[in-house]
Amino acid sequence: MARKTPIERYRNIGISAHIDAGKTTTTERVLFYTGVNHKLGEVHDGAATMDWMEQEQERGITITSAATTCFWKGMAGNFPAHHINIIDTPGHVDFTIEVERSMRVLDGACMVYCAVGGVQPQSETVWRQANKYKVPRLAFVNKMDRTGANFFKVYDQMRARLKANPVPMQVPIGAEDSFEGVIDLVKMKAIIWDDASQGMKFEYGDIPEHLLADAKKWRENMVEAAAEASEELMNKYLEEGDLSEADIKAAIRQRTIASEIVPMMCGTAFKNKGVQAMLDGVVEYLPSPVDIPPVPGLNEDDEPVVRKAEDTEKFSALAFKIATDPFVGQLCFIRCYSGTLNSGDTVFNSVKEKKERIGRIVQMHANQREEIKEMLAGDIAAIVGLKDTTTGDTLCDDKAIVVLERMIFPEPVISQAVEPKTKADQEKMGLALNRLAAEDPSFRVRTDEESGQTIIAGMGELHLDIIVDRMKREFGVEATVGKPQVAYRETIRKVCEEIEGKFVKQSGGRGQYGHVVLKIEPQEPGKGFEFIDAIKGGTVPREYIPAVEKGVRETLTSGVLAGYPVVDVKVTLFFGSYHDVDSNENAFRMAASMAFKDGCRKASPVILEPMMAVEVETPEDYAGTVMGDLSSRRGMVQGMDEIAGGGGKIIKAEVPLSEMFGYSTSLRSATQGRATYSMEFKHYSEAPKNVIDAIVTSKAPK
């Protein structure tokens, strides 16, 4: 099947924002304008499009789509139709894993900022992730009609807090109640949108007299930014004092894709002003799949390879989100990086090393879902019926195996026991938790062997609250939750040169005999567990060595101090002995386990606790109180910045997670509700002796 839209006219973008910047309204307006311009029914001549809103109303649930496809021909109908996939990115820091996931499959992003609130802490987290994945972006300053709106303040904050290089492509006409429209600095015209048509119509007008000098200053700033794209343009600019519209747009596009600049626009999504021009900006300045480097991966032999965004290349795709639809089952959203995929194909999941059959392929639109027969390079769609694929897996052609990314998911730092309220909820709860764990790799479920309780673990208190809330909302399961528990770890600090483990039972008949000598030493943080076989002369036969490693690995799950998992140790097996008749795998497994436990006791065991990076935004009057409170929680205050544009302080600190429970309540009461905070996991560090003693005592058998 031939392409309907050439890949150069594809844009895979995310709309990303802090919680209150108005992302939802902005996205809704994007879907409204693009949907009106392009009636889906016409394109496919009565192809089966199933109305998705009706289903939602019948079921009373809302399915938020992880990726929505729409088309845009330009505010003035001046472009051929562009195929835009909008990937949803959550705004909360507990879901940074979700943001990372979506950043991975984006080619560009629109960062939405509130004209009043400006750049918030979460905006910084998202910005850092966009830097990490080198995502070109443009900025849209929303809510220009709100009291206190100030476009230029946001410009200053982007420079100060994000160290960004924003280039306004527009400046506002008025602000707050008097916000009328924008000045297009490329055309040097005012754009005024028509209220009656909900912003569908607009007209170009002359720039208001009192704004002309300002507009000229900002235009010069923009043209200079464009001229820096190449020596040739710089010379042209120096000779002629200006650049043509085509030159400016091409140069701004080039520098945006190289992540050197961030074009800035503004408007108010709620009042239907500005989003239309932002969509034009997406088409004009953000990259298509072929404007960015081909996707890197590893082949079967772990050698680096790339996959070009071409239909003729071998098929490769990344699963970036699993969503559960109670009626269709699991939807797996994938981004096709290269090649083509047809419904009915069998593909290879190179992470799980299993084959998967592609059932139906569906594309989500603003108010309907459409079944498509094939996906091409650059496409994003959802697949129904995958059995083993989870977030972060690669799907590829089994004759050209590639792994696009080894997803590294953070280990959960907090856990809670959950119990169903009634017997009837018991089975439903298990099902619900497994479904939710399949969707979100940073959320884990396990059963505590001693108490038989179900334990859920995640990235923060809010993360687990939302999981419990979703169980109730989507699966109808009422549950009670226990007190949050911190995920401590254990490690050792000294080397234990030689520790012996002997497991012998020889009392007649078939006996048991296993004997090992191990060296146990600490590794640098994050290095994990390493097992080295240094047996010389067959003192432990080859066939028993895996059993020795297994014995040590099984013991790692429960440390000697308080039963927490042991991390960052290196174990070397260098000597042992065996019995021709009585030795077996089980005996060596037991001997290794005993030796490792003994060795850990002698190697100065310690407990590690998760440390969180905490950022508090507070009015200046309360800064001292906040810092004192963080210090009393064993926090290390690492610095204090001004909130850009005045209005308070940002305090950055590193605080143990165990001291942060209930922090939001105490921060609220200490600052009369005027301070906000965000926190994310930073690293594990050794707990002080008094804390270790308290943990050990609390875990001791009563």
Curated annotation (Swiss-Prot):
GO terms for biological process: ribosome disassembly. Residues 8-290 form the tr-type G domain. Its main location: cytoplasm. GTP binds at residues 17-24, 88-92, 142-145. GO terms for molecular function: GTP binding; GTPase activity; guanosine tetraphosphate binding; translation elongation factor activity. One of its GO terms (cellular component) is cytoplasm. It is found in: Cytoplasm. Keywords: Cytoplasm, Elongation factor, GTP-binding, Nucleotide-binding, Protein biosynthesis. Catalyzes the GTP-dependent ribosomal translocation step during translation elongation. During this step, the ribosome changes from the pre-translocational (PRE) to the post-translocational (POST) state as the newly formed A-site-bound peptidyl-tRNA and P-site-bound deacylated tRNA move to the P and E sites, respectively. Catalyzes the coordinated movement of the two tRNA molecules, the mRNA and conformational changes in the ribosome. Belongs to the TRAFAC class translation factor GTPase superfamily. Classic translation factor GTPase family. EF-G/EF-2 subfamily. This is Elongation factor G.
